[in-house]
Amino acid sequence: MISRKSLITASILITCLMAVATSALADEQGFSVEAWGQSFKSAVKAKNSQEMLNLLDMKVLEKSALTCVDCSTKEKLQTARKLFAKKQFDQSLELYNQIPKGTDYWFQAVEEKGWNYFRQNDSEKALAQSKTLLSPQFSEVVGTEAYFLQSLTQLKICDYKGIFATHEMFKEKQKGRVVDVQKLASTGMNEAFAKVVAKADLFPLVAKDLGDSFLHLPVLYYKDLELQGQLLKFKVSQKALEVLKAEDGGMLKLQATLDKMNQDSFKKMKARLATLAEDETKENSKIVQKLNLIEVEAIQRIHTDLSLSKDLYSKGKFKDTQEDQLVFMDDGRPWIDELDKFEVSAKACPQGIRRKM
């Protein structure tokens, strides 16, 4: 019987391999700690002090190891976001659609396409994006906002049964990772990241080399340059110490320097991961509050027999508002909560299908 862990890992690998050319490019440009170790070993054997110092120049190493293999994709995503902010939805969609499947930013592109369609009142296409993200292959590794997108869109079309199903899926698929990330904000280390550290060899880090760590760590944690830089220092100093001790070449002063680098980089690596986890935990907390708010609204609509005019339910438009407001069209009263600088007027449904259960 195939285990859940194996299934998730296989799904992640399939996703990563959807863009074979991109992955191959990353490998070709990758920096290998093992290969570096062989060069360092040769320099130690030859007692070539200058070559050893050159190999231990971390500024040079970071520049060569942490190359940007998806800069154009990231730039397209950033430009698409700027266009979206300007309400140039068609132009932003054009760029989102250019982000290839299997790249590190594809999940974000699909989610943001969903919000694009949502703002254009195209609920069908918004749901198409969210359902892609919440498919069995991806539902445990995408960010929590994908669930908010689907839930809010379902509220907009009065699919109350769908809302409760989405929230149940959120609890089932995301609770474990949300809790793990919350704990990580305090510790900076867990079993999943310890495995990543132990196995890390190629830089920059790529998704296909990270196994099932996505289930227990912040979204796109491996794209953070500061984290990668500290991990690189840790791995290089660790490898250099192994070589020096194996060759028994003395160099106690160099060993002491490397040992300090190793310890410092490990502490900074943990601190950075804790910061990433803390940031994501704050966002996750907001998402949970939003989902709770939507659920309360759905329950209120189901159990309260309000008489609403067709005119009230005919527009369903969105408008700019003050920070942290969500307004439903049932009575126009604002719900103040940890919401992200926008107000939503939920699109109403025809009276006959309003209570879709």
Locate predicted features.
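Extracytoplasmic/secretory-pathway proteins
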Residues: 29-32, 36-43, 52-55, 159-357
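"A position-specific structural signal for the A-helix of alpha-solenoid helical repeats
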Residues: 37-41, 77-78, 112, 148-149, ...
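Solenoid-like repeat scaffolds
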Residues: 31, 60-69, 97-105, 132-140, ...
